Amino acid sequence: MKTQKEITISGVGGQGMILCGTLIAEAAAVHEHKKATLSSEYGVETRGTFAKSDVIVSDEEIYFPDVTEPDLVVCLHPVAYARYAGKIGGALLLYNSDEVTPDEIVPGPQKGLAITKMAKELGNPQTANILTMGAIAGLTEVITPEGAKEAIRRFFKGKSDKVIALNEKAFDLGYGAGCGLREE
């Protein structure tokens, strides 16, 4: 059984993919004592250009830090979907169904999740990245909810209890949705 998971989280700048990947790597390495690597790519503009975060989590040593054979590719924006759809082998492609219209002829498994809508229903569209983190955790079981929430609390330390609670709620909502997708 493969103990290493390779995940690409992609979209455009301003959607929080870098933070999402960072928190997954921290949850795995610091709070769950696994091995993890993180790399990011983004344009010089802070918003609107392609951006991605690559995370590898393993129970064993990781000898090459870049994602080469992804298990999961997350696309939060049409720009990212166009870049990866049909080009990722047998990896599962998880897309934000509020932003991306999937191409039905693209080979390989694809699943949509209404990430933007769920974030708006929580009252804060900026929680979409934490929702995505939860969905990834629920879908892949790469990190536990406990480890994820420790990373969330550490990152938002110094913010109000309301902000921390909102982000934990966003994680839980995404986690439940991800578990549901895993069971499909």
State the predicted function of each range.
Residues 1-184:
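Active-site cofactor/cluster-binding pocket
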